[in-house]
């Protein structure tokens, strides 16, 4: 099983627009072979001392059955199209 945490730093004031665009691909991604989980998460205030809030960060949590399934997902033409569309909304992103 492969777990992926993608951290997306969204341009100020663009988080809701980013989430609308992102949620548009979720059903298609979840239908892909090997996709176990795929969802976005945003920070909210919990009051816990170690928490660092960043209202412009979206964390995308993914779980795939295999590395091959993840590579096939990342290589999908519709994902390339999606990344091109969200480019205007994103400052930077990284995965772990």
Model-derived features: where do they sit?
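Short glycine-biased active-site loop of nucleotidyltransferases that positions the nucleotide triphosphate
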Residues: 49-53
């Amino acid at each position: 099983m492969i777990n992926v945490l993608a951290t997306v730093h969204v341009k100020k004031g663009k988080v809701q627009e980013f989430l609308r665009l992102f949620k548009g691909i979720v059903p298609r991604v979840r239908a892909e072979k090997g996709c176990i989980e795929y969802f976005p998460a945003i920070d909210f205030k919990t009051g816990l001392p170690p928490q660092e809030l960043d209202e412009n960060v979206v964390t995308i949590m993914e779980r795939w059955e295999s590395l091959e399934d993840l590579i096939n997902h990342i290589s999908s033409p519709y994902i390339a199209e999606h990344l091109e569309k969200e480019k205007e909304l994103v400052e930077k992103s990284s995965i772990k």
